């Protein structure tokens, strides 16, 4: 190699995915060679799990790539609950997954939520309560002061109509 040469490294996917591709419409907000950004609708799980083997974001993304004959392993960086709608970040290969996962761990990627809540919520506040897996569930989480991981949520009320509040 000499100065100015360009080296391109291709790391092939190591195995076929266990997830079945499924033709599901995707709202792709952005895509480049490293990432895929999708607006995930509510009532759609991110990936297959107990009682939700089909109609997941992973099924749809695998269809999107398999229909283009592009090998792909599903690597979701910012997961959302099944009933939550919003922007989801996916890595397109092992290197971007590693970089983005590290950025998540170091809190360099910020997530922000909007929620409609019953009643009139305080104008702002902070919830500092440790979260742990709920008993008998692999998905649900609950406040657990003995075993929970640190979780801090800052919120502000954006609007209220006296019955419900829009909270950020």
Regions found by a protein language model. Name each.
Residues 1-168:
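RNA pseudouridine synthases
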């Amino acid at each position: 190699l000499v100065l100015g040469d360009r080296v391109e490294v291709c790391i092939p996917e190591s195995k076929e995915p266990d997830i079945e591709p499924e033709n599901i419409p995707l709202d792709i907000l952005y895509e480049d060679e490293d990432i895929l950004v999708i607006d995930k609708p509510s009532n759609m799980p991110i990936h297959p799990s107990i009682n939700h083997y089909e109609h997941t974001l992973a099924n749809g993304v695998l269809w999107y790539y398999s229909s283009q004959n592009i090998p792909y392993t599903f690597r979701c960086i910012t997961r959302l609950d099944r009933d939550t709608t919003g922007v989801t970040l996916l890595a397109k290969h092992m290197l971007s997954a590693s970089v983005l996962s590290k950025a998540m761990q170091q809190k360099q990627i910020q997530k922000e939520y909007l929620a409609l809540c019953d009643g009139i919520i305080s104008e702002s506040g902070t919830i500092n309560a440790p979260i742990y897996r709920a008993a008998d569930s692999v998905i649900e989480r609950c406040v657990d002061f003995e075993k929970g991981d640190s979780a801090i949520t800052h919120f502000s009320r954006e609007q209220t109509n006296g019955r419900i509040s829009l909270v950020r």
